[in-house]
From Swiss-Prot:
<comment type="pathway">
    <text>Cofactor biosynthesis; ubiquinone biosynthesis.</text>
</comment>
<keyword id="KW-0489">Methyltransferase</keyword>
<protein>
    <recommendedName>
        <fullName>Ubiquinone/menaquinone biosynthesis C-methyltransferase UbiE</fullName>
        <ecNumber>2.1.1.163</ecNumber>
        <ecNumber>2.1.1.201</ecNumber>
    </recommendedName>
</protein>
<dbReference type="GO" id="GO:0032259">
    <property type="term" value="P:methylation"/>
</dbReference>
<feature type="binding site">
    <location>
        <position position="140"/>
    </location>
    <ligand>
        <name>S-adenosyl-L-methionine</name>
    </ligand>
</feature>
<comment type="similarity">
    <text>Belongs to the class I-like SAM-binding methyltransferase superfamily. MenG/UbiE family.</text>
</comment>
<dbReference type="InterPro" id="IPR023576">
    <property type="entry name" value="UbiE/COQ5_MeTrFase_CS"/>
</dbReference>
<feature type="binding site">
    <location>
        <position position="95"/>
    </location>
    <ligand>
        <name>S-adenosyl-L-methionine</name>
    </ligand>
</feature>
<comment type="function">
    <text>Methyltransferase required for the conversion of demethylmenaquinol (DMKH2) to menaquinol (MKH2) and the conversion of 2-polyprenyl-6-methoxy-1,4-benzoquinol (DDMQH2) to 2-polyprenyl-3-methyl-6-methoxy-1,4-benzoquinol (DMQH2).</text>
</comment>
<comment type="pathway">
    <text>Quinol/quinone metabolism; menaquinone biosynthesis; menaquinol from 1,4-dihydroxy-2-naphthoate: step 2/2.</text>
</comment>
<keyword id="KW-0808">Transferase</keyword>
<dbReference type="InterPro" id="IPR029063">
    <property type="entry name" value="SAM-dependent_MTases_sf"/>
</dbReference>
<dbReference type="GO" id="GO:0043770">
    <property type="term" value="F:demethylmenaquinone methyltransferase activity"/>
</dbReference>
<keyword id="KW-0474">Menaquinone biosynthesis</keyword>
<dbReference type="InterPro" id="IPR004033">
    <property type="entry name" value="UbiE/COQ5_MeTrFase"/>
</dbReference>
<feature type="binding site">
    <location>
        <begin position="123"/>
        <end position="124"/>
    </location>
    <ligand>
        <name>S-adenosyl-L-methionine</name>
    </ligand>
</feature>
<dbReference type="GO" id="GO:0008425">
    <property type="term" value="F:2-methoxy-6-polyprenyl-1,4-benzoquinol methyltransferase activity"/>
</dbReference>
Length: 251
């Protein structure tokens, strides 16, 4: 029950007090961390790898640059960026959830990604970095879980260098109506059952499906990025808008 005097936000389809959402999201990701990569493949039929590859290709990251992989989870993007920036560059894998951060660290070290990667537990709304630190920031399937998205976008803008760019890869609104209906049926009826079967946690995957529906659509997120200060903001619809990649610059 939320008191009238409290500021509220959404947790999936629930209305909750703002100060409660962070802990509730944390519980979800503590629960799913161990099966996160397996479930990503099952949920997207492996297509998430193509979406992330496209994000890397659009990043413009070069040797010697400094990159922040925010809400980086198990480190898929960090692994790619580590190779791109080379020994003279640096990649920061940041996640608010220590279980996800631990999984990412173990996974990357097991495949030999060491030396130019650092790990930081950080809240996107109050990034613990100096102004003008990063050449590129990515946040992949993480923004929809942030309580105050506008505050997080302003925080990302602050720590970007002039000339730097932000890429937001996130589930969005399908642009083909029959696909939208089929996607809803899959998300709300099949996905929680797969989550229960594979990860023994149908409720967390029900939340993830609901959080996708509550996330701003393509044009709304574009406007939010512009309001945070980003310029030349554009987006690419991927898989007919099931996912969108937004990109904005700090000049």
């Amino acid at each position: 029950m939320v008191e009238d005097s409290q500021e509220t936000t959404h947790f999936g389809f629930q209305t909750v007090a703002k100060e409660q959402k962070q802990d509730m999201v944390a519980h979800v990701f503590h629960s799913v961390a161990a099966k996160y990569d397996v479930m990503n493949d099952l949920m997207s039929f492996g297509i998430h790898r193509l979406w992330k590859r496209f994000t890397i290709d659009c990043s413009g990251v070069r040797r010697g640059q400094t990159v922040l992989d925010l809400a980086g989870g198990t480190g898929d993007l960090t692994a790619k960026f580590s190779r791109l920036v080379g020994e003279t560059g640096r990649v920061m894998l940041a996640d608010i959830n220590d279980s996800m951060l631990k999984m990412g660290r173990e996974k990357l070290r097991n495949i030999g990604i060491v030396g130019n990667v650092e790990y930081v537990q950080a809240n996107a709304e109050a990034l613990p970095f100096a102004d003008n630190t990063f050449d590129c920031i990515t946040i992949s399937f993480g923004l929809r879980n942030v309580t105050d998205k506008e505050k997080a976008l302003r925080s990302m803008y602050r720590v970007l260098k002039p000339g730097g760019r932000l890429l937001v890869l996130e589930f969005s609104k399908p642009i083909i109506e029959p696909l939208s209906k089929a996607y809803d049926a899959y998300s709300f009826h099949i996905l929680p059952k797969v989550g229960e079967l594979v990860a023994k946690d149908g409720d967390s995957y029900r939340y993830l499906a609901e959080s996708i529906r509550m996330h701003p659509d393509q044009e709304t997120l574009k406007g939010m990025m512009q309001d945070a200060g980003f310029e030349s903001v554009d987006y690419h619809n991927l898989t007919a808008g099931i996912v969108a990649l937004h990109r904005g610059y700090k000049f």
